[in-house]
Amino acid sequence: MTRQRAHIHPFLHAASNLEKHLETLFAESNIRHRQALVLDALRAIGASSQQYLAKHFGVSAGTMSSMISRLEALGYVQRERDVSDRRIEIISNTAAGIAALESVEKYWLDGDAMVENILGTEDAEKFFTLADELSKGLGGGRPKPEKRGT
């Protein structure tokens, strides 16, 4: 009886290797690529609660709190209390955070170029489209602005 190999293994291995490559590129900066993703999300959707960000990124509130604390210590985000519910902290990018994000976007473009160099332009486009569909199907994708009470 032959064992059927799962098709997902090469994808998981490739994703892990790509993430390691990005981590190496981001080591030149003072933020990690996942922190840059948070800055990018805040740029796209505007100020959001820490809880909303944790849910979107699929991490615990504690993990998101640690990430936000580090970004805040670097001067890249600021926290403010929600005027409608003082228990909620609203996180937003600072000008320094936007500048930091813009300085590391080249690393994501390097990742895109690496995939394109391996797969070719046409297959890379298909891959990125399929990866986006997969991400959305798994509950990911670009975040939407948070709906909060006023």
Language-model segments: residues:
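N-terminal leader segment of winged-helix/HTH proteins
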Residues: M1-S29, P145
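Short alpha-helical "packing" element that flanks the helix-turn-helix/winged-helix DNA-binding module
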Residues: V38-L39
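Short capping segments at the starts of secondary-structure elements
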Residues: I45-S49
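The alpha-helix within a helix-turn-helix
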Residues: A54
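Key DNA-contact positions within bacterial/archaeal DNA-binding proteins
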Residues: G62
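Charged, amphipathic alpha-helical coiled-coil/dimerization segments
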Residues: S69-D132, K136
